[in-house]
Structures are given as structure tokens and as C-alpha cells.
Regions:
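N-terminal cap/lid segment of alpha/beta-hydrolase-fold proteins
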Residues: 1-10
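Conserved HGGG/HGGXW glycine-rich cap/lid loop of the alpha/beta-hydrolase fold
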Residues: 9-62
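Residue in the alpha/beta-hydrolase core beta-strand immediately N-terminal to the catalytic nucleophile
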Residues: 53, 89, 112-115
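Conserved acidic catalytic loop of the alpha/beta-hydrolase fold
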Residues: 70-88
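Gly/Ala-rich beta-loop-alpha elbow adjacent to hydrolase catalytic centers
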Residues: 92, 96, 100
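Flexible "cap/lid" loop of the alpha/beta hydrolase fold
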Residues: 101-106, 110-142
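Conserved alpha/beta-hydrolase catalytic His-Asp/Glu region
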Residues: 124-130, 141-197
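Conserved loop-alpha-helix segment in the C-terminal half of the alpha/beta-hydrolase fold
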Residues: 202-239, 244
């Protein structure tokens, strides 16, 4: 397992394949780089593919303190430069989706295009904001039940594969409490419309069922966005229906990047 160190934090990643543009896969809140395995395998046939464990996640270091989206962006920009990847296609899920958006806004010289796979809300509806805030408070108080219930009930369809739900829960619930709480605070503090207003690189949004960001609002915030919508999958659509996701990313790459 290769690593790089940025600002004292060791970051684990996998690298495979050859070809430009390179892909960087960015997982979501309390997940790890394995969640994009179906996409990494598919695109490594013709492209260099790098899958990263964000700080606080997977096999990367898990420092105390805040976890703003900007910290992930700085880490990824450092990784792109260090590995000499050129201009990449940044593919992010959930928290990783808004990280890809901010990366495209801050570093257009390093980004050929972004793919946001059911990204975290660019604007949080008040009721959802309050509910997630209560989950953060519960985590900090040592109560993990609301966190588990949120993952199992809100992020999957009733028809989702039970083995996949179990696997996702196992990884996400293993995340240390300080990371889970502070990373979610970073998500809630993110100014999505501001990032969207500054992001001028080609962008693809892949909505799930139900979408965290309705496509018509994504078009309003990010006029250059291409909207797609997976069928028969909840929030983890890149794992539930990988062929659909791979096909749409491939079409985006051919026609827009």
C-alpha cells in the first residue's frame, strides 16, 4: 500500500493502470477507497486510476481536530502534483462529491472534469440539517444508534442488497467518533452554491433514489452540469448499479471532457 504525507498526515492510496486523463476517486463520509472498486477496475483498463483514503478514513492517519472540506481538497491537490497525474477526472461520492466540486473550483489547472455521485447537499434543507446535527451530537455523546439508523434507513432503498448494506455499515460504523462527528460538521459547514459558482470545469451529477440534490437545483447552481440518474439504487449507486455509473461516466468522458 503506497502512501504520501501531507502536512504531517499520512494518506493511503492505490494506483493502477495507465493513460490520460487520470482518474482520482474520492469516497464519502466514514467510507474508504474500496467503495469505488467497481469504477477503479473498469477505468484502469485505459486510464491511470488513483483511489485515495481521505484523512481520517481507511488506512490514512486520523488526527484530532476539524475536518473541513478544504483539508481534503488540499490533500488531493498535493497528491495530483506529487504523483504527476496531470489534469484529472475527479470522481467523488457524497462528501467526496462536494470535495470534487471544491477541487474543480480551486484547482482548474489540475482538473479536466468532475463527477459528483449523489453528492452531499449543496444546500441543506432545515429539517435535514437539524436531523443530521442531532446525529452529530449523539456521536459526540457516545450514542452510536442514531448514526447506524441513519445509514441503514436513509441511504438505501428497501430493495437494496442486504449483504451490501451490512458491508457498508461495517465500514462506516468502524470510523472513530471524532472523525465521524468532525467530518460531518465539515460537510454541514460547506458552502455548496459558492463552490458551484466558481467551478467552471465540465461536471457530471449522478443522482440516486431519492436524490440528495434534485437535478433541477443542480442545474440552477451549476449551469454547466450534465445530470444523470441511476435506476434501482440508493445513495451508494456506484456500488449497487456499477454498470450504470460506469457507462454514464464513460459517456461524460467521451463527450464533455
Amino acid at each position: 500500500m503506497p502512501t504520501i504525507t501531507h502536512n504531517g498526515v499520512k494518506l493511503a492510496y492505490d494506483s493502477r493502470g495507465k493513460g490520460r486523463p487520470a482518474f482520482v476517486f474520492i469516497h464519502g463520509w466514514t467510507c474508504d477507497r474500496s467503495f469505488f472498486a467497481p469504477q477503479a477496475k473498469h477505468f484502469a483498463r485505459r486510464h491511470r486510476v488513483v483511489s485515495l483514503d481521505l484523512r481520517g478514513h481507511g488506512q490514512s492517519d486520523k488526527p484530532q481536530g476539524p475536518y473541513p472540506i478544504s483539508a481534503y481538497v488540499d490533500d488531493i491537490a498535493f497528491l495530483i502534483s506529487t504523483l504527476r497525474l496531470g489534469k484529472v477526472v475527479a470522481v467523488g461520492h457524497s462528501m467526496g462529491g462536494i470535495t470534487a466540486l471544491q477541487l474543480g473550483a480551486d484547482h482548474p489547472d489540475k482538473v479536466a472534469g468532475i463527477v459528483m455521485v449523489d453528492p452531499a447537499p449543496l444546500i441543506w434543507p432545515p429539517e435535514l440539517n437539524a436531523g443530521v446535527g442531532a446525529i452529530v451530537a449523539a456521536i459526540e455523546a457516545g450514542d452510536q444508534k442514531p448514526r447506524r439508523q441513519f445509514i441503514a434507513d436513509a441511504l438505501f432503498m428497501k430493495t437494496s442488497d442486504k449483504a451490501l448494506v451490512k458491508r457498508v455499515l461495517k465500514v462506516m460504523m468502524a470510523s472513530p467518533s471524532h472523525v465521524a462527528a468532525n467530518a460531518m460538521k465539515g460537510i454541514l459547514a460547506f458552502d455548496g452554491p459558492a463552490a458551484a459558482a466558481r467551478c467552471k470545469v465540465p461536471a457530471l451529477h449522478l443522482a440516486a433514489t431519492p436524490p440528495l440534490n434534485p437535478p433541477h437545483l443542480m442545474t440552477q447552481w451549476l449551469p454547466n452540469v450534465v445530470n444523470g440518474w441511476t435506476v434501482g439504487a440508493g445513495h451508494f449507486n456506484m456500488m449497487e448499479v456499477p454498470d450504470q455509473v460506469n457507462s454514464m461516466i464513460g459517456a461524460f468522458l467521451r463527450h464533455y471532457v
